[in-house]
């Protein structure tokens, strides 16, 4: 993005409940050093030797992409859809944003998968909600599935773990890194006239603005097979974000599986599981992944790559346990 994480440019939460918060200062822009976004080569190393092609695309308002980041609005769902349409020959592509030579993805089979972590884990789900033909499988890792649940909680303003005072407009500043000549327009029309106007830090209530950034409201469009991945100790994007989508997709009858580990923010499923998931739905190879347990849970003290399989999540064989505090009240007690 074009902004750092200095808290002097976050919201100041030190004010009376129900009062208008102090105005947030906007950060100075960080100068862009390279006009070609740096993409990790990890997926290239993992997937290309197995016969997959890897495509890196930039979300609106980042890299070479036009438009503005909106932090969960429709353009961030339609942008990856456009890439998938191009991969399937339904949209035109060019070597430059304005002109250039036509480019066709003649090498693509038409079967596409998406994987990413955190903000980049939200984008596969966003694309899937459009119901775009050809997006066969996704693996969202620690995805933010509702910006209300990320920044609000039952009418209260909350902040993701470690970022006191962050809000949706702060994330906009962090993500926004596209065409510098468009920056002022995006800041005025998206950051000031939309995000800051409707985020409502006074009441923390759920409104149309937040509803438009809740992917559960668009879940009926999902047709892709979904492998959700999250950590139980993620205090940034809470595991509830994946659980709510997992439960909704089960009710819809969409192929869905989940992987949970004991770490913090991020963490892909073991690669053998990732490979099986994409092999089944992109190569259309019957590797019996559907017959395997639906939930893979890394138990306490176990290695992240050695999850325990369960029929579902929550475990159908689990039962409630009553816990009671003990001790004399003068020191740390036990349960």
Which residue ranges define each predicted feature?
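Loop/turn elements at helix/coil->beta-strand transitions in domains of secreted/extracellular proteins
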Residues: 50-55, 108-112, 133-137, 223-226, ...
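Catalytic nucleophile-loop/oxyanion-hole region of alpha/beta-hydrolase
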Residues: 34-37, 63-82, 91-94, 265-270
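Catalytic histidine neighborhood in serine/cysteine hydrolases
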Residues: 249-266
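Conserved alpha/beta-hydrolase
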Residues: 48-64
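Conserved alpha/beta-hydrolase "acid-adjacent" motif
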Residues: 235-241
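Accessory cap/linker subdomain of secreted extracellular hydrolases
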Residues: 4-33, 37-45, 49, 77, ...
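C-terminal, loop-rich substrate-recognition/catalytic regions characterized by aromatic stacking residues
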Residues: 268-335
């Amino acid at each position: 993005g074009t902004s750092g994480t200095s808290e002097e440019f976050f919201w100041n939460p030190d004010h009376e409940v129900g009062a208008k918060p102090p105005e947030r200062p906007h950060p100075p822009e960080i100068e862009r050093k390279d006009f070609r976004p740096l993409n990790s080569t990890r997926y290239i190393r993992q997937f290309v030797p197995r016969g997959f092609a890897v495509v890196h695309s930039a979300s609106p308002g980042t890299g070479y992409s036009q438009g503005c980041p909106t932090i969960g609005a429709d353009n961030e769902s339609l942008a990856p859809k456009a890439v998938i349409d191009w991969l399937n020959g339904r949209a035109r592509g060019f070597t430059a944003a304005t002109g250039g030579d036509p480019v066709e993805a003649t090498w693509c089979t038409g079967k596409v998968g998406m994987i990413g972590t955190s903000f980049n884990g939200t984008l596969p789900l966003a694309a899937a909600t459009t119901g775009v033909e050809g997006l066969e499988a996704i693996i969202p890792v620690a995805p933010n599935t509702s910006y209300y649940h990320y920044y609000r909680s039952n009418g209260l303003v909350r902040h993701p773990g470690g970022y006191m005072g962050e809000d949706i407009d702060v994330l906009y500043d962090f993500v926004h890194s596209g065409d510098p000549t468009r920056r002022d327009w995006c800041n005025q029309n998206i950051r000031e006239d939309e995000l800051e106007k409707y985020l409502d830090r006074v009441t923390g209530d759920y409104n149309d603005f937040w509803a438009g950034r809740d992917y559960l409201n668009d879940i009926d469009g999902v047709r892709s097979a979904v492998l959700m991945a999250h950590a139980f100790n993620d205090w940034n994007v809470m595991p509830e974000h994946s659980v709510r989508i997992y439960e909704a997709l089960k009710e819809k009858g969409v192929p869905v599986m989940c992987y949970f580990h004991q770490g913090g923010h991020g963490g892909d499923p073991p690669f053998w599981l990732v490979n099986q998931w994409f092999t089944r739905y992109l190569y259309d190879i019957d590797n019996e992944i559907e017959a395997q347990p639906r939930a893979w849970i890394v138990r306490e003290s176990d290695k992240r790559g050695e999850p325990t399989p369960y029929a579902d999540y929550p475990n159908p064989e689990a039962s409630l346990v009553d816990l009671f505090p003990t001790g004399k009240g003068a020191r740390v007690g036990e349960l």
